[in-house]
A protein has these predicted regions:
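Cytosolic regulatory regions of ion transport systems
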Residues: 1-142
Length: 142
């Protein structure tokens, strides 16, 4: 696998972990043409922009219809439109958050001790992201 990201700090962090990652803009034709799209098994985009994800799914499916393409959408309409473009799965974070909480409740975590482990894990993750300068995961393009 290969991670493509527009944030140089993310690339540096991934490379330190020996995760193959390159800096780039997925809408850059030269970058896309340099990737072995005909050989990939799966592509995952966490970018919330509809047009970018539409470009990703259309480009990959044109070259490799069997590749699994997982994308992210902000709205129900965007998710449904990405499915029309042949996305295999579309993440909708707002709804996933609700599902996650429902699962926590169904696991009978009805007292403060049931949430202690989740809370500690979450606080650790938040501090790690804050230490990296991430207040919110949005990355603006120049």
């Amino acid at each position: 696998y290969l991670v493509v990201d527009f944030n140089p700090e993310t690339i540096a962090d991934l490379n330190k972990l020996k995760i193959p990652a390159i800096y780039g803009d997925v809408e850059d034709d030269a970058l896309i043409k340099s990737l072995p799209l005909d050989k990939i098994k799966m592509a995952i985009s966490t970018i919330p922009d509809f047009e970018t994800n539409k470009f990703i799914v259309e480009t990959i499916k044109r070259v490799n219809p069997k590749a699994i393409v997982i994308l992210r959408a902000h709205t129900i309409e965007d998710a449904l439109n990405l499915y029309k473009k042949k996305a295999d799965y579309v993440l909708t974070p707002y709804f996933l958050g609700g599902e996650y909480l429902a699962n926590m409740l169904s696991e009978e975590k009805t007292d403060e001790h049931g949430y202690k482990k989740e809370k500690e894990k979450h606080i650790k993750m938040l501090f790690e992201r804050l230490k990296k300068g991430q207040e919110h995961p949005d990355v603006e393009k120049n």
